[in-house]
Amino acid sequence: MSEKEGTLRMMASGQWAVCRPGETPHEITSGDLFHIEVAGELHLTRMEFRHSPRRGYYTVDGYPLRDRLRAAIGEHG
């Protein structure tokens, strides 16, 4: 696991964050690049926010967002 790698978590604020043991959660905001685990590998994607009709955060590549997925902050993960 790299120093930027952790697990994806939905925060009380409604934003997704990469959480690492002993570290403050790193919230992922609209426009941020991050890596998410898909089929056992980390893939680079970008977070966006949809205002309607289904309000919420999503990845531009359509990757599912779920608690406890392996994820990494930044472009280089």
Label for each model-derived stretch:
Residues M1-E3, E37-R46:
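Short coil-to-beta-strand transition motifs
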Residues M1-H26:
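Mixed-charge, Lys/Arg-rich low-complexity intrinsically disordered regions
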Residues G6-L8, H35, M47-F49:
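Assembly/interface hotspot detector across virion components, adhesins/toxins, and nucleic-acid enzymes
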Residues M11-S13, I28-D32, S52-R54:
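A short, compositionally biased
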Residues A12, A17, A39, A71-A72:
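A sequence-composition feature that detects small, non-aromatic residues
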Residues Q15-R20, F34, R55-T59:
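Short polybasic amphipathic segments
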Residues T24-V38:
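Short coil-to-beta transition motif at edge beta-strands of beta-rich domains
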Residues E41-G77:
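Short, compact, well-ordered microdomains
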